[in-house]
């Protein structure tokens, strides 16, 4: 979990690649904790924090080249503060209450 929560997350992940290579440790998959989705102190699904991971496409490709599948942690809700919340609400894509409003409950970082 510490890798994607670090401010220099991408750099730490590449160090991980180097370390397993140096120690000849086999690795076919890596679970990315939700730090890669961070906006401020919040975790916002389907969002790459480009301060931590400036080039996510290259990052994913580099791991794939090494035979490592990245498995991203995806939270089961969009926070009401998520940048795409209003757009998704407008499209009617949320689970709804009986009155037609999006179902909202408490999650780790806020309501979603």
Named regions from a protein language model:
Residues 1-112:
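Aromatic-lined carbohydrate-binding/catalytic grooves of carbohydrate-active enzymes
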């Amino acid at each position: 979990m510490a890798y994607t929560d670090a401010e220099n997350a991408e750099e730490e992940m590449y160090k991980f690649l180097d370390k397993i290579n140096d120690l000849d440790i086999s690795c076919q998959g890596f679970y990315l904790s939700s730090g890669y989705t961070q906006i401020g102190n919040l975790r916002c699904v389907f969002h790459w924090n480009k301060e931590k991971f400036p080039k996510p496409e290259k990052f994913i490709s580099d791991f794939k080249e090494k035979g490592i599948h990245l498995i991203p942690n995806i939270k089961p809700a969009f926070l009401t503060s998520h940048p795409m919340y209003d757009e998704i609400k407008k499209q009617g894509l949320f689970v709804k209450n009986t009155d037609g409003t999006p179902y909202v409950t408490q999650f780790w970082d806020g309501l979603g």
